[in-house]
Amino acid sequence: VYSESQDPNVSRPFRVCEHCGQPTPSHEPQCVNCQAVSLQAVVAEQEAKAERRFLRALFARATPVTYAILVVNLALYLLMSVVAGGNILTNIIKGSDSLTLVAFGAKINELVLAGEWFRLVTPIFIHIGLLHIASNSYALWIIGPLIERLYGSARYLLLYLLAGIGGGILSLIWQVAADKPSGPSAGASGAIFGLFGVIMVFSYKYRKELPPNFRSAIKSSFLPVIVINLFIGTTIPFIDNAAHVGGLISGALLTLLIPYLAPDSKRVSKLGLITIAMCALVIIYSFARAYLVSEPYLEEHKRRAGRVENISN
């Protein structure tokens, strides 16, 4: 006599066919008696096809903005290493001095409060040392293409920029409120944490339309990374964890407002091109402003370097 086990944890080698009522092997989509296809097998096959279509359409999208950001970050880092003077290789390894960082637009709270608001944008693209830019570049390389494919290049750039600004604002508020000394602050980590915030809220907001395996992979891949990085930020004193938290919150809130670009949606639109152009103009304008006020810092840097050289001679 055939009897199904009532314990869900017990492996069931047989199932009851919905059509003929006879036992048939569970791993076979068709009943061995009446050849009818299991409804569960049909549903599973439909879900598998939908997931394959979703992933094919998603990964067919290019990710030019992520690569452009990586190139800009690296180019600015190398340019700072040259402008800082001295041994370029040493500057690349150790990073530029404080005055060079400020000249290129690093965040200094007093200067931001004095009206140099462009210093909430420029720090997103400059870095303090080799390990700093290497770790941020790696993180962006991992998560950036996924977010850009999900949201499209225009929305992705907007999310990245606004999350970075949000991180800078919370860092400013936190340091001023805590009366902490203000040194040069820079790096893409606030914007990258914003992307972590995006993926967290995205996986919940669209949980009903995302393929289950894809949604599970997102949670298992990125949630531990977020927790570990926030923990590291609280244990190492020179890390601006307020910028990380600010970026994370900004990215999460923006995801509630900005819809993602479904795989069957049009990739490029006029609004998207306008968005990219506006973001690019904001970035260019911010660095232009930084250049216009950079001379005093670069002159002071040269003066100090000359004084050190005279002493050594």
Regions found by a protein language model. Name each.
Residues 69, 73-80, 142, 199, ...:
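Alpha-helical transmembrane segments of multi-pass membrane proteins
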Residues 66-188, 235-239:
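N-terminal TM1-TM2 helical hairpin plus the immediately adjacent luminal interfacial "cap"
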Residues 182-203, 243:
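Membrane-interface micro-motifs in multi-pass membrane enzymes
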Residues 149, 202-219, 259-271:
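Alpha-helical transmembrane bundle and helix-membrane interface signal
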Residues 10-24, 103-111, 131-136, 163-168, ...:
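Hydrophobic alpha-helical transmembrane segments
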Residues 139, 158, 162-166, 170, ...:
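Hydrophobic faces of alpha-helical transmembrane segments in multi-pass integral membrane proteins
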Residues 144, 198-205, 251-259:
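Hydrophobic transmembrane alpha-helices
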Residues 1-61, 230-313:
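C-terminal transmembrane module of polytopic alpha-helical membrane proteins
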